[in-house]
Regions:
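Short N-terminal binding/cap micro-motifs at the start of the first secondary-structure element
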Residues: 10-16, 42-43
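Cytochrome P450 core scaffold surrounding the K-helix E-X-X-R motif
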Residues: 43-49
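Conserved hydrophobic/aromatic beta-strand scaffold that supports enzyme active sites
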Residues: 18-23, 69-71, 103-105, 111
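NAD(P)H dinucleotide-binding glycine-rich loop of Rossmann-like/cofactor-binding domains
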Residues: 90-153
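Glycine-rich beta-strand-centered segment in the early N-terminal region that forms part
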Residues: 22-40, 52-95
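Residue-level signal for nonpolar/aromatic packing positions in well-ordered secondary structure
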Residues: 3, 70-72, 85, 114, ...
Length: 153
């Protein structure tokens, strides 16, 4: 399958290339997602630039990406809650990465069904930034009816 891989650390437009890699092996708790959209987040850009080498050492070449949306095309025996053909989105675990590929195997517990009223692109853009926003609001103790100011966006 095709995968967008980081070949060496550097500039975003100079160190990535499409390579053929093996299709992921589906474990019993996994669903195999045919990728329709994947996001590149600030953490991916920091990894590409080499800024996180000390914290996240990864062997190169590496398939990056944490956020994905697509269609379930296979599932393990213990992957409850999903059927072949389900439209889904997910954030893969920190140690996994690899959503910038044609397929990604993800533990079913990290996957959700895609809301029907959003596109694959919108769904792929939600997991990491949505989690960050939610954690931030929870951290500062925002409650129902509190007012906040959101800059930009």
């Amino acid at each position: 399958m095709k995968s967008l891989q980081l070949l060496e650390y550097g500039e975003l437009n100079e160190c990535l290339a499409f390579n053929e890699i093996d299709k992921p092996i589906v474990r019993s708790q996994d669903v195999l997602i045919e990728v329709k959209a994947a996001a590149i987040n600030p953490i991916d850009k920091s990894i590409i630039a080499g800024n996180l080498r000390a914290l996240l050492p990864i062997p190169l070449p590496a398939t990056l990406g944490y956020d994905v949306s697509g269609v379930v095309v296979e599932k393990g025996a213990d992957a409850a809650g999903f059927e072949i053909g389900d439209l889904v989105y997910a954030r893969v675990p920190q140690e996994q990465m690899g959503t910038l590929a044609e397929f990604v195997a993800v533990a079913a517990e990290a996957v959700s069904k895609k809301p029907a009223n959003i596109s694959f692109e919108e769904a792929a853009g939600l997991p990491l930034v949505g989690l960050t926003a939610l954690q931030s609001l929870n951290h500062v103790g925002i409650k129902e009816h509190d007012k906040i100011l959101i800059h930009a966006g």
